[in-house]
Swiss-Prot record:
The gene is pcm. GO terms for cellular component: cytoplasm. It is found in: Cytoplasm. Keywords: Cytoplasm, Methyltransferase, S-adenosyl-L-methionine, Transferase. GO terms for molecular function: protein-L-isoaspartate (D-aspartate) O-methyltransferase activity. This is Protein-L-isoaspartate O-methyltransferase. It comes from the Bacteria. Catalyzes the methyl esterification of L-isoaspartyl residues in peptides and proteins that result from spontaneous decomposition of normal L-aspartyl and L-asparaginyl residues. It plays a role in the repair and/or degradation of damaged proteins.
């Protein structure tokens, strides 16, 4: 039995076009209030992005659901997340697949996310402090890659780490950003533009 706040959010997401019931179920199961500061707990089930410190945000539930749905995951999918952030998107993925790999540039966010995931008994996640532009070569190839910050162009390392028929979902751009879905077919990449979005930038190289 879900609360009225959760049911209200799920109904909003359905109205906005989210149809994958597995994704909606994962949204219902993950307590978003555990991934935000205490000052924002009362807003946790609103369909809005919230600050998490270090100039980063927790994405609005619609965007989390949309990007997750676009990955077309199965339980066996090998998934890479770029930008662990609060760990909320990571937790959604962890409910949908057997294992998630996640890279975070900011060490303090990585540690906070790991703690939250353990508190929720989500032990099927590997996190790494590193440059998201470089992906996670040692764990490649991946069936699905999701990027939760916007690079100005598509990182070539992430394309290289996609398995054949794998899917990459990410926001791309600086002033004007668009959500892209990229499917690999051999050495070709089929790129679809989904919708206009607004994300924090994917910072290259420098770790924090």
């Amino acid at each position: 039995m879900v609360s009225k706040r959760v049911e209200s959010l799920l109904n909003q997401l359905r109205t906005q076009g989210i149809v994958d019931e597995r994704v909606l179920e994962a949204i219902a199961l993950v307590p978003r209030e555990k991934f935000v500061d205490e000052a924002f707990e009362h807003k946790a089930w609103e369909n809005t992005a919230l600050p998490i410190g270090q100039g980063q945000t927790i994405s609005q539930p619609y965007m989390v659901a949309r990007m997750t749905e676009l990955l077309t995951l199965t339980p066996e999918s090998r998934v890479l997340e770029i930008g662990t952030g609060s760990g909320y998107q990571t937790a959604i993925l962890a409910h949908l697949v057997h294992h998630v790999c996640s890279v975070e540039r900011i060490k303090s966010l990585q540690w906070q996310a790991r703690r939250r995931l353990k508190q929720l008994d989500l032990h099927n996640v590997s996190t790494r402090h590193g440059d998201g532009w470089q992906g996670w070569q040692a764990r490649a190839p991946f069936d699905a890659i999701i990027v939760t910050a916007a690079p100005p162009e598509i990182p070539t390392a992430l394309l290289a780490q996609l398995d054949d028929e794998g899917v990459l979902v990410l926001p791309v751009g600086e002033e004007h950003q668009f959500l892209k879905r990229i499917r690999r077919r051999g050495n070709e990449f089929i790129i679809d533009t989904v919708e206009a979005v607004r994300f924090v930038p994917l910072v290259k190289g420098e770790l924090a």
